């Protein structure tokens, strides 16, 4: 089953005080030109659920989308785009950081990276920052169609090797993804589905005395 199918827009917020009361959340984040909005639209099988722009940094707020199981997908502002006023950029950084560190409903992070340029400095900073939460991370190496099959295999292997220091201490996984070729949808569903199943199981198990 596609967890993201039929997702619908719920609300958008620009301050943590306006965060909605939700059960569980999966957040999507990435550099401003990594293909995050396209990945969300592909996973949800919706042409314009998340706005796709040729201008990086278009997502300027935290957008919530309700999934058919009642949980939520959260589209976070892209990072690394500097062509905005400093005050606006600082607000994005604080909003993003506070949400990732403080949001109790957040059970995992889907991090989108361009397969041609994975693990750039800001991506590594994001991994280091989120690592302190202990929550799982799944990386989508987007735009994989821009690489040959051999390049895809090589890139995936290299990224897995570079992630080893993180995966030794944290649940972190990575896959190839292409919005154009609809590549990797099932794998992303399985990974996120396992997070939701684990969270549901933990919530329903009796508390230890």
Curated annotation (Swiss-Prot):
Residues 22-198 form the EngB-type G domain. SUPFAM superfamilies: P-loop containing nucleoside triphosphate hydrolases (SSF52540). Mg(2+) binds at residues 37, 59. GO terms for cellular component: cytosol. Pfam families: MMR_HSR1. Keywords: Cell cycle, Cell division, GTP-binding, Magnesium, Metal-binding, Nucleotide-binding, Septation. Its cofactor is Mg(2+). It comes from the Bacteria. One of its GO terms (molecular function) is metal ion binding. GO terms for biological process: division septum assembly. Transmembrane segments: none annotated. Belongs to the TRAFAC class TrmE-Era-EngA-EngB-Septin-like GTPase superfamily. EngB GTPase family. Necessary for normal cell division and for the maintenance of normal septation. This is Probable GTP-binding protein EngB. The gene is engB.
